[in-house]
């Protein structure tokens, strides 16, 4: 099976497909990291400041699935993800949940250990290796170029960490052939990806593409196999909360509180704590019905801090 590697940086249904397959075919695609190759093992924060944003978030594709028509559903079975041995996490000026509080570029290079199923993020902090594609979707029916950065009902940069091997993603088809693409692979991420990046890592991904005409959807859905939740789910957690009438502000408050906890309990500086929130901590909405306030929690899996206890 040949590995596909041609990329594009916008959604545009006029882009010529790089490959055509029959429904049910298995496809292997080479995914570049979210910087589009601008960052590597030897990069520094200065390289983050110099990023060319026209080159970020490349996706590999598009793949034309024969027979797929608007109104159909494309089933994407994620079969395998194979990483390289490194990844990066950055604080990018102007980007992230607390962008106004973290104005300076910051970079961390992590070691990805596929066989051990772990990511060495910092001294004494080890994350589970749980790879998935952050950006995955099909072409929009609207003409012209569309940014890959915001997600849409056609998929895109959804950053759903449960889209791991064993999960099936269902996408509405908007154009003939679906025009499937994938990119932005991550070695680890917390729900919310609050600093704007995960452990960004180049990988090869293998998927099976099928057409479902018995299923009509208006936005992405996915099926997670039994027992395929994060390995940290069963361990102990420390949880901070944000409470208030604005969901975004509640999320910001919960994140600020976790940054404070990581500093006072484990001695992390603010930048490292913010980045750790992004790659390992999960934001969750606890409560929505008791107006006027929302309750948002941020969950720290304490098992990852074993070397800092």
Enumerate the predicted regions with their spans.
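N-terminal, Lys/Arg-enriched amphipathic/low-complexity engagement segments
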Residues: 1-51
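Short, structured beta-strand/loop micro-motifs enriched in basic residues and often containing a Trp
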Residues: 2-13, 52-60, 146-154
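Loop/turn positions that initiate beta-strands
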Residues: 24, 68-71, 166
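A generic structural signal for residues embedded in beta-strands
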Residues: 29, 73-76, 171
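Short, Lys/Arg- and Gly-enriched loop/turn segments at beta-strand edges
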Residues: 34-45, 81-91, 177-187, 286-289
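Intrinsically disordered, low-complexity linker/loop segments enriched in Gly/Pro
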Residues: 80-165, 170
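Conserved mixed alpha/beta catalytic, RNA-binding, or beta-rich assembly cores of soluble enzyme
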Residues: 129-133, 137-157, 161-247
């Amino acid at each position: 099976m040949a590995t596909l590697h041609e990329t594009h940086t916008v959604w545009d249904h006029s882009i010529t497909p790089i490959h055509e397959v029959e429904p049910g075919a298995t496809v292997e695609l080479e995914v570049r990291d979210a910087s589009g190759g601008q960052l590597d093992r030897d990069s520094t924060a200065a390289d983050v400041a110099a990023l060319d944003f026209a080159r970020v978030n490349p996706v590999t594709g598009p793949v034309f699935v024969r027979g797929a028509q608007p109104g159909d559903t494309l089933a994407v079975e994620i079969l395998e993800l194979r990483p390289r041995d490194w990844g990066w996490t950055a604080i990018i000026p102007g980007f992230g949940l607390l962008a106004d509080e973290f104005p300076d570029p910051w970079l961390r290079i992590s070691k990805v250990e596929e066989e051990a199923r772990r990511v060495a993020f910092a001294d004494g902090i080890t994350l589970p290796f749980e790879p998935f594609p952050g950006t995955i979707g099909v072409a929009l029916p609207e003409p012209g170029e569309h940014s890959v950065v915001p997600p849409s009902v056609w998929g895109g940069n959804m950053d759903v960490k449960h889209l791991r091997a064993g999960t099936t993603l269902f996408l509405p088809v908007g154009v003939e052939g679906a025009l499937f693409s994938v990119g932005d692979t991550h070695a680890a991420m917390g729900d919310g990806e609050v600093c704007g990046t995960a452990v960004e890592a180049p990988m090869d991904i293998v998927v099976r593409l099928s057409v479902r005409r018995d299923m009509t959807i208006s936005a992405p859905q996915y099926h997670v196999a039994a027992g395929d939740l994060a390995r940290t789910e069963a361990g102990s957690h420390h949880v901070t909360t944000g409470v208030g009438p604005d969901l975004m502000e509640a999320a910001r408050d919960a994140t600020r509180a976790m940054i404070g906890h990581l500093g006072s309990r484990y001695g992390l500086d603010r930048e490292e704590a913010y980045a750790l929130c992004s790659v390992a901590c999960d934001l969750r909405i606890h409560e929505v019905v008791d107006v006027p306030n929302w309750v948002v929690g941020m969950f720290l899996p304490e098992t990852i801090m074993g070397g800092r206890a």
